[in-house]
C-alpha cells in the first residue's frame, strides 16, 4: 500500500511493521518535499511519524478521538486522514491549514495553535463520553515543551483525580519545544531520557561480556532483557511522579521503534483510568540537517532540500523588526544592568536570542508559561529592575488577567514588546496579532505605542525602558521599511505625542504603527484626484495626542483612521471616543480588520482580501466622502 492510497487512518489496521515502515518513509518524503516548497513546520512532524502510525494502528478512528497539542507536529496526521493529494497547498490561501481545524477534516477533533491545551480538551471529551454513556477512547498527544505550560499541569492534576475516566496521554519527549526547553520539569525529563551512569554501566557490562571467549555473544544476547530492565529501573523516578498524580505510567518508549510503540499502546488501551505513555523521539528525525539544528529547522521558509539552505531572496531585504528589536535592546542593556529580557520559550522568534548570547545574565526564558512571565516581570519591577517582556501579540492574550491584576493595578514599570502584531500570514487565525490594541487599551494605567518603522522602534525601546509604569509596544512580523538605523544615541519620545507627516486641507488621516506608510501611499493616490490629506503618525493609541488631533478634526471635518488590528475596540474606536468626548460630530471612516477571523494566507493576500492595500483604501475613502470616481477605474 502507498501513502497516496490512504484516505482513512483505519486502513493502517492489519499492516505489518515492514509495511508501516514503508509508509513512514513515504510520509517523511512527502513532508520534506512539501515544506521545502511551501515553508512550514519541519522538525516537529518528522519526529512523530512512527508515533502516529503506531497510535493510529491501535485505534478505531471512526470512534476514537485524538487531540494534538499545538498542532505543528500533526502533518503526518494530516497525510493519513485524506489530505495527501492536496497537501501541496499547505499553508497557502484556501489550502491545507498549518494547524488543526475542526472545519477542515472530521479527524481534526480539536483546533489548536497555542500550546498546552490538549490534555484539557481530551479530558473534556472523555467526561462528555462518560456522561452520555458512550464508549470510545480519548487521546492527547503533547510535547515535553507544552508540558511546561501551567494549563497542561492543571489538566493532569484534574485527570489524576478521576481513576475511572479512561484517558490516554502520549508524552512526545524530544527535549525541545521551539527552542530548547527550560525549567525543572524539563531538566528532570531529560535526566530520565539519558541517565549517563546507567548507560555507562549497561554498555560496560555488554562490552565485557562480548569479550568472553566462545560464549560471549550468547551471553550478551541473553543479557539484553536484564540491560533493559536496569535502564527502566533508572526511569522509574519520573514514572513515580505521574503515578503519584493518579496516572498509570508506561515508558519511556523508543519513539522510532514501531514494534515497541504498537505493543505499548495496545497495553495502554487495556487500562480503564488515566494512562501516560512516555515516548522518546528525535525532532527532525530522518533529515540530517533538521536533526543537527533542531531550533533552526523547527519551522522553515521555502528551502533547498539537498542543501537544507533557505532559497535566496530576489533582492536584499532590510533587517526584520525582531532583529532590530533584539540588537537595540542588547545595546541598551549593556549600559543599563536593570534591563532584563524575558521570553516564554520564543527567544529566536522575538530576537531575544541576541540578548541571550551577549548578556545571558540579563535574559530569562520561563518556558511556555506566559502568565508566569508577566508576574515574574512584575516582581522584578517591584525591586528596581526594568523587565522587557518580549512576546507575540497572540500569546500575551494568555496572560490578560496578570497584565491587569499584577502589573497595571500596581502601576509597575513592565515593558511589553509585542512581536507579530497585526497580520502574520500562513499560521492563520490562532496566530494573527489582531486584538492587542483593543484588549490592552481598556486597562487603566497602560500606555500603548507602535512604531511606523524600525528606526522609530529603536526610539520607542528607549521610551518604554525610561517610562515609570506599564507600557506596551506592538510591531509587525517581517522586514522593516529599510530606513537608516542609528547604532546608538536614540532619543526617547514624549508620551502621548503624535507626528504630523503631511499637510492637507480636505481630509485628516490618522495612522497607527505599521499602517503609517500605507496611509502615506493612500494620500498620494488621493492627491492625484485632487484630495489633499493631512497625515498623522499617531505613535500612541493611549494616550492619544488630543491637543493635535481634536483641533485638526474640527478644522478639516473628515477623518480616516488606519490600523492593522481589529476594528472593534481598536485605534479607530479610540479616536471616535475622543472626538465624541469633545462633542465633535465629524464623519469618521475607520479602516482596519473587521469583526472576522483572518484565515491563513500570505500577508499580502490577506491585506488584499481585507481591503487594506493603498488603492483599495483610497477607493473606500472616495466612496465614503462622495466621489463617484474610483482610483482603480481611473488608473485602469
UniProtKB/Swiss-Prot annotation:
What's a Pfam family in this record? Transket_pyr
What reaction gets catalysed by this protein? D-glyceraldehyde 3-phosphate + pyruvate + H(+) = 1-deoxy-D-xylulose 5-phosphate + CO2
Q: Name the Enzyme Commission number(s) assigned to this protein.
A: 2.2.1.7
Cofactor section: Mg(2+); thiamine diphosphate
| Amino acids binding Mg(2+) | 144, 174
What's in the GO CC field? cytosol
Tell me the residue numbers annotated for binding thiamine diphosphate. Answer: 72, 113-115, 145-146, 174, 287, 370
User: Which Gene3D superfamilies did the record assign?
Assistant: 3.40.50.920, 3.40.50.970
Its keywords, alphabetically, are:
Isoprene biosynthesis, Magnesium, Metal-binding, Thiamine biosynthesis, Thiamine pyrophosphate, Transferase
GO molecular function terms noted in the UniProt entry = 1-deoxy-D-xylulose-5-phosphate synthase activity; magnesium ion binding; thiamine pyrophosphate binding
Q: What does this protein do?
A: Catalyzes the acyloin condensation reaction between C atoms 2 and 3 of pyruvate and glyceraldehyde 3-phosphate to yield 1-deoxy-D-xylulose-5-phosphate (DXP).
What is the similarity comment for this entry?
Belongs to the transketolase family. DXPS subfamily.
Q: What is this protein called?
A: 1-deoxy-D-xylulose-5-phosphate synthase
The organism's lineage?
Answer: Bacteria, Bacillati, Cyanobacteriota, Cyanophyceae, Synechococcales
Amino acid at each position: 500500500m502507498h501513502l497516496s492510497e490512504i484516505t482513512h487512518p483505519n486502513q493502517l489496521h492489519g499492516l505489518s511493521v515492514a509495511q508501516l515502515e514503508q509508509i513512514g518513509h513515504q510520509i517523511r518524503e512527502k513532508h520534506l518535499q512539501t515544506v521545502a516548497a511551501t515553508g512550514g513546520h519541519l522538525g516537529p512532524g518528522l519526529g512523530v511519524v512512527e508515533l502516529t502510525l503506531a497510535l493510529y494502528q491501535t485505534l478505531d478512528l471512526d470512534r476514537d478521538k485524538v487531540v494534538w497539542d499545538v498542532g505543528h507536529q500533526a502533518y503526518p496526521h494530516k497525510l493519513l486522514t485524506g489530505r495527501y493529494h492536496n497537501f501541496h497547498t499547505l499553508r497557502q490561501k484556501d489550502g491545507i491549514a498549518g494547524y488543526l481545524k475542526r472545519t477542515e477534516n472530521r479527524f481534526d477533533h480539536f483546533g489548536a495553535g497555542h500550546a498546552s491545551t490538549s490534555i484539557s480538551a481530551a479530558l473534556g471529551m472523555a467526561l462528555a463520553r462518560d456522561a452520555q454513556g458512550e464508549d470510545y477512547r480519548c487521546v492527547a498527544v503533547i510535547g515535553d515543551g507544552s508540558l511546561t505550560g501551567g494549563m497542561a499541569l492543571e489538566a493532569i492534576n484534574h485527570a489524576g483525580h478521576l481513576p475511572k475516566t479512561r484517558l490516554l496521554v502520549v508524552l512526545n519527549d524530544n527535549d525541545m519545544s521551539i527552542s530548547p526547553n527550560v525549567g525543572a520539569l524539563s531538566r528532570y525529563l531529560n535526566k530520565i531520557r539519558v541517565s549517563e551512569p546507567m548507560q555507562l554501566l549497561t554498555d560496560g557490562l555488554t562490552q565485557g561480556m562480548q569479550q568472553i571467549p566462545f560464549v560471549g555473544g550468547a551471553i550478551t544476547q541473553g543479557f539484553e532483557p536484564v540491560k533493559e530492565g536496569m535502564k527502566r529501573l533508572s526511569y522509574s523516578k519520573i514514572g513515580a511522579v505521574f503515578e503519584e498524580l493518579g496516572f498509570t505510567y508506561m515508558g519511556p518508549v523508543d519513539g522510532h521503534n514501531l514494534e515497541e510503540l504498537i505493543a505499548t499502546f495496545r497495553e495502554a488501551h487495556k487500562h480503564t483510568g488515566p494512562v501516560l505513555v512516555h515516548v522518546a523521539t528525535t525532532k527532525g528525525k530522518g533529515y540530517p540537517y533538521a536533526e543537527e539544528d533542531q531550533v533552526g529547522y523547527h519551522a522553515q521558509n521555502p528551502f533547498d532540500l539537498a542543501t537544507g539552505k533557505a532559497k535566496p531572496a530576489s533582492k536584499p531585504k532590510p533587517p526584520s523588526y525582531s532583529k532590530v528589536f533584539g540588537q537595540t535592546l542588547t545595546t541598551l542593556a549593556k549600559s543599563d544592568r536593570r534591563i532584563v529580557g524575558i521570553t516564554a520559550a520564543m527567544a529566536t522568534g522575538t530576537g531575544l536570542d541576541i540578548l541571550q548570547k551577549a548578556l545571558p545574565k540579563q535574559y530569562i526564558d520561563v518556558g511556555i508559561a506566559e502568565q508566569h512571565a508577566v508576574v515574574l516581570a512584575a516582581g522584578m519591577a517591584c525591586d528596581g529592575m526594568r523587565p522587557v517582556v518580549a512576546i507575540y501579540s497572540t500569546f500575551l492574550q494568555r496572560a490578560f488577567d496578570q497584565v491587569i491584576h499584577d502589573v497595571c493595578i500596581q502601576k509597575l514599570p513592565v515593558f511589553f514588546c509585542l512581536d507579530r502584531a497585526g497580520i502574520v500570514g500562513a499560521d492563520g487565525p490562532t496566530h494573527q496579532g489582531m486584538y492587542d490594541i483593543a484588549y490592552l487599551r481598556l486597562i487603566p494605567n497602560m500606555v500603548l505605542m507602535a512604531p511606523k518603522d524600525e528606526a522609530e522602534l529603536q526610539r520607542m525601546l528607549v521610551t518604554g525602558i525610561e517610562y515609570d509604569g506599564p507600557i506596551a509596544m506592538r510591531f509587525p512580523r517581517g522586514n522593516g521599511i529599510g530606513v537608516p538605523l542609528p547604532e546608538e544615541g536614540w532619543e526617547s519620545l514624549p508620551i502621548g505625542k503624535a507626528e504630523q507627516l503631511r499637510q492637507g486641507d480636505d481630509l485628516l488621516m490618522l495612522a497607527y504603527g505599521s499602517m503609517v506608510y500605507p496611509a502615506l501611499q493612500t494620500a498620494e493616490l488621493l492627491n492625484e484626484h485632487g484630495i489633499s490629506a493631512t497625515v498623522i503618525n499617531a505613535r500612541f493609541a493611549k494616550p492619544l495626542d488630543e491637543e493635535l488631533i481634536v483641533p485638526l478634526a474640527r478644522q478639516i471635518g473628515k477623518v480616516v483612521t488606519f490600523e492593522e488590528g481589529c476594528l472593534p475596540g481598536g485605534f479607530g474606536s479610540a479616536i471616535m471616543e475622543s472626538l465624541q468626548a469633545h462633542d465633535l460630530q465629524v464623519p469618521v471612516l475607520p479602516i482596519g480588520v473587521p469583526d472576522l477571523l483572518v484565515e491563513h494566507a500570505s500577508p499580502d493576500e490577506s491585506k488584499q482580501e481585507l481591503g487594506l492595500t493603498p488603492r483599495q483604501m483610497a477607493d473606500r475613502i472616495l466612496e465614503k466622502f462622495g466621489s463617484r470616481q474610483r482610483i482603480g477605474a481611473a488608473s485602469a
